[in-house]
Amino acid sequence: MIKILLLFLLSGAAHALDVASLHPLITDALRQVGGERVKIVEIGKPGMNVHEFQPRASDLKKMAKARLIFASGKNLEPYLGDLEDALASHQVLVEVGKYVPSQKISAKDEVYSCCPSHSHGGIDPHWWHNVRNMERAVRIIQRTLAKADPEGKSYYAARSKTATGQLRALDQWVKGQVSTIPKGKRHLVTAHAAFGYFCKAYGFKATFVQGLSAKGEVPAKQLAESIHSLRAAGIPTVFPEKAANPKILKQIAKESGAQIGRPLIADGSTASYQKMIQANVGNIVAGLRR
């Protein structure tokens, strides 16, 4: 920490670099890497509905001074094309997820996607559920900040090294926690298709049962198929999400013989990436070791 502070003091930066963030997890990463050298305008805040959010005129005004506007990317923010057209010539839009490996939502799972823009073989936008992807994101942010603020290159590099080290430790912690679940029980059942990256990275079979809608209903055939498959597989726990219809999930759990687990944070609308991962993994382990 002393080394990082000295790097900042010696850098001679008179003003912080103005940036804006469209997603809470990106904001967290910006703080980790940018520290005192960046001034962040939080457009996407914790608790937001990332699939329904649209920037307002007041948001555009808030980010007017930002040289860099950071987005999660992978079409999580379908408004980015219009936003980029509205930016000034000195502003640059950075889609962090663009530089992270992608996974597609399969044809059989498209009905369980978060929204139409992510169905029909579209890219799954929830890339952050693989901790190694967030490590990649930190390095992307480091390089982007250093390009805009060359005097801070060493400062950003030092902070990025610290952050990526913490993420590697977090990734190992996740693997250790997952190892306590018998391999035959590593079957993650959630409402919508948001945990594909997590399941691929940490050895789970993913099943989605209703799609993302707090009000919408599930077609009878789809509901019956979900109940039958969960009952046949002996799934002990299904996991709710804040934005999904709790009534439907309760019905699926009751008729399949499963229990309702603790809710998972699917869309990253939280202030701390590490706390989100720890909470999700803790809830998954508690539910599947029953």
Which residues fall in each region the model found?
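Sec-dependent N-terminal signal peptides
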Residues: 2-13
